[in-house]
């Protein structure tokens, strides 16, 4: 059952950080789904057609990191917006898929909410 709100999928392996992003999404008026790995995120994307934005960390365990996930999402679900985050490494525009955006960690809650609104708002 969907809420009728725009849907954001938060992909983050650190539970506390994932929960914080979910809270920001929900307080910003979105329905939030979560995944701890890219593989879990792909399964959710395959089962839901209403996801507007994937917000993913780069460094995660599993078969692919967040950048590979972002490129996979762009290839399979072109309308889905992509917001990538990381505390390490120099992520540049050339690393991101088309229309992807980068938000460095640690991020300000207001900036995260603003990015969610700009990228997935109704």
Regions found by a protein language model. Name each.
Residues 1-9, 15, 22, 40, ...:
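Non-catalytic signal-transmission and effector/linker regions of two-component phosphorelay proteins
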Residues 15-33:
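Two-component/phosphorelay signaling modules centered on CheY-like receiver
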Residues 34-53, 93:
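Acidic, metal-coordinating helix/loop segments flanking the phosphotransfer/catalytic sites
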Residues 37, 64-69:
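Acidic catalytic/metal-coordinating carboxylates
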Residues 57-58:
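Active-site residues of response regulator receiver
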Residues 85-86:
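Hydrophobic/aromatic residues positioned on beta-strands within the core alpha/beta folds
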Residues 91-98:
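Short loop/helix-cap segments at secondary-structure boundaries that form the rim of catalytic
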């Amino acid at each position: 059952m969907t809420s009728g709100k725009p849907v954001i999928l938060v992909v983050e392996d650190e539970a506390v950080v994932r929960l914080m992003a979910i809270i920001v999404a929900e307080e910003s008026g979105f329905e939030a789904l979560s995944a701890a790995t890219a593989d879990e995120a792909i399964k959710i994307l395959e089962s839901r057609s209403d996801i507007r934005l994937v917000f993913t960390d780069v460094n995660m365990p599993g078969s692919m990191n967040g950048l590979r996930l972002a490129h996979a999402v762009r290839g399979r679900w072109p309308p889905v917006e992509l917001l990538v985050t990381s505390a390490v490494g120099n992520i540049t525009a050339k690393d991101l898929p088309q229309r992807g955006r980068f938000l460095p960690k640690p991020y300000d809650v207001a900036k995260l909410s603003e990015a969610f609104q700009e990228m997935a708002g109704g």
